[in-house]
């Protein structure tokens, strides 16, 4: 089947937001108005089309990025649903990698919230063009102007409204379109499908003229001809303004702000128009970078069917009907069923069996897909999240790898029976393949299975899936903090390993300089050997020895991170030296760091934001201080106070219940991992006693 839409008519975009800003409802309405969904699914009753895992329906939060294809004004929209809960930022990050543009949804009552900041920063990292939709304008206390201010203040982004609401709260009637200078009004019946243009109400005319002048001044700055004409007193045409807004979105010069209420079916169609008018097509973004599979030189792929095939696998899901599904973005070339592909990341072959176009959870079998498409492949055996698939014969490539953060929290799981043990192994293998921020390991001493993740909710949901989807009965331990260790000072260690008991002995002497590295630098090994004091073939043994012990740490068995080891000198014996002897020597040298390297225990510090009514402020701050929290500041949001603090994760377990009790359920909080910090000595002593 040949292409049905030109690649210029594609819009691959996602909807990103804080939890509860109305992201899923907005997506639902988009699917409804674009004709892909016959009934509107409400998150309130757990039936939204995009939220198709049982766990999501129950909790009313979107966990997995489902990809959906829909159509609007002859344009093809591929919508990637991204989760809004902070424990799933990995999912957001993964979907941002494959998007060309995004709609940021804000709650008109709350404005920019902590998770909005997190996903905005991630979108900055991947340079994703954005437009902003201020939702929930029907809510009591919704304030469009204040939301726009919060974008400027909290995100440091240049916000330029291209609409503003007519009426507010329960009297929300529609919006003023500042590009066309028309009022757009919805009827209250017919689920918002019918709407019409009217003249702008007289009492809003002054505001509209002022807001449009601000829009036009910012828009014409991006086009020399338009700027010249405007300075000469000529008002730009609607087409010119749209062209300039599009340029602003593509370059990040400013962000157009729209408004409405998805729940009340107002403002969604103009939002779709804006997606088509302002967000980029695959050809508007820079070519995708990659590494040539054979030469390892940097190379690029343009968004074109004529280029060699390059595909990124960005999500793996277990589907009850089809088995394992791999969601893929085709960056270049054409893919057909039956084709043999190279997984260039792992140097393995794959075959395209079934290829599906997804609509949240209905699927359509297709035979061919082209550059710009987002499809799901069934039955891939070797492919994991972040892998590249390409044509093995036409200049194979490895696209940029996605980087995933290290988990900060862990729990032990013990299956109740032998049958559960077997089911658990299979289930965990699948869950780890689907989600790179979730890892599984075995504690060698206790034999327990350890699950590691990004937060309490993240692990709760994994356990829920184990019990519900895979029917595993297991005992779950209490959550534990993923502590780390670091060196306190630079130190030289000289160690000789000698074992001579008749026959061939073992001999190796190593002199290693250990020093603390920058945060995030990981383990770095260097050899500064000159003149063959240690023969070249033995040096890998030194590195291997250090790598085998660094994760067992020095103080309490936690991985030693961010340090550099330089092999400066050593000695060997013609007969008794071997790679193994140097491996043993470097391991023993590492252990001496406990006494000589002033090791420190590190703990994950979370960035916490609590939103509380004024009357509970004292209790909230007192409680955070008692948790070793460092209060960073507070400001007002509506009639609530927002407290920002850094708090050790170890002191945040069960905080949700404490806060609920303290504020009669009226305060909320969110937290994200921020950095690792040394643990105060009196606390470190207790932790070391517990784990060592």
From Swiss-Prot:
Function summary: Catalyzes the GTP-dependent ribosomal translocation step during translation elongation. During this step, the ribosome changes from the pre-translocational (PRE) to the post-translocational (POST) state as the newly formed A-site-bound peptidyl-tRNA and P-site-bound deacylated tRNA move to the P and E sites, respectively. Catalyzes the coordinated movement of the two tRNA molecules, the mRNA and conformational changes in the ribosome.
One matching Pfam family: EF-G_D2
Classification via InterPro entries: EF-G-like_DII, EFG_II, EFG_III, EFG_III/V, EFG_IV, EFG_V, EFG_V-like, G_TR_CS
Compartmental location: Cytoplasm
Name of the protein: Elongation factor G
Organism: Caulobacter vibrioides (strain NA1000 / CB15N)
Domain tr-type G: 8-283
CDD domains recorded: EF-G, EFG_III, EFG_mtEFG1_IV, EFG_mtEFG_C, EFG_mtEFG_II
GO CC aspect terms: cytoplasm
Source taxon at top rank: Bacteria
UniProt keywords, alphabetically: Cytoplasm, Elongation factor, GTP-binding, Nucleotide-binding, Protein biosynthesis
GO biological process: ribosome disassembly
Ranges annotated as spanning the membrane: none
Residues reported to bind GTP: 17-24, 81-85, 135-138
Gene Ontology terms for molecular function: GTP binding; GTPase activity; translation elongation factor activity
The family this protein is said to belong to: Belongs to the TRAFAC class translation factor GTPase superfamily. Classic translation factor GTPase family. EF-G/EF-2 subfamily.
